[in-house]
């Protein structure tokens, strides 16, 4: 979805520009920006506070792009965006509303909506009869499959309950570990050495993760540039994500909390 957003902008802005993104971010965001052909350069910033919330991915002259990231709430677009803006939602399997990957672009701008609707369907205009569709421009085969849609529709049925359970889980973690985390996708804490901590937890049967390594230090993106991201450089070795699953039983949660406390 992020890739497609930049492709749409590229159709009428010919000069590529620089994009500012947090260094601690999933590589998919950086990759989408670069491969879209719109942005020729990444500028990594030392923003470590965006996690758990949506954030402005890019501010164009006439509208902004918001990545909902780990957040999904009723009426979110109207609360955070103007009609001409774009908001991206991810259906990654472990996100609040998970599917079999893919995502969604939301806008109240009809011209943008029309372009995306055609772009994801091979650049073809819409018609009730498939054979009456015309080719507007070279597009992409990026529309949601029936299987993806079915999985999402089924997950919608239990979405409210899932959010309530995840909030209770986050609140319990906050109480036990002294944090004020609000994300219902990732629960991150700091340890002295996240790799050692993760290996120890794995031995105890607890799977944790790192969200995320600092991309500005990765050779793929670092073309001899030096970015001032001291917080990201520290946190990439200290941040760790605890299990965040609505299926966790009380005994499993109690076990996780006890073992984390023993090893931090």
Q: Positions of the model-derived regions?
A:
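Conserved PLP cofactor-binding pocket of PLP-dependent enzymes
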Residues: 70, 125-131, 196-228, 234-240
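Active-site region of PLP-dependent enzymes
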Residues: 72-77, 83-190
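PLP-dependent aminotransferase-like
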Residues: 7-68, 72-75
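Short beta-strand segments
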Residues: 151, 184-191, 209-213, 241-243
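Generic structural signal for small/hydrophobic residues in well-ordered secondary structure
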Residues: 1, 19, 37, 67, ...
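PLP-dependent enzyme catalytic core of the Aspartate aminotransferase-like
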Residues: 223-264
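Short, conserved alpha-helix that lines the donor NDP-sugar binding/gating region
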Residues: 2-7, 170
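Short amphipathic alpha-helices in soluble, non-transmembrane regions
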Residues: 116, 197-205, 256-261
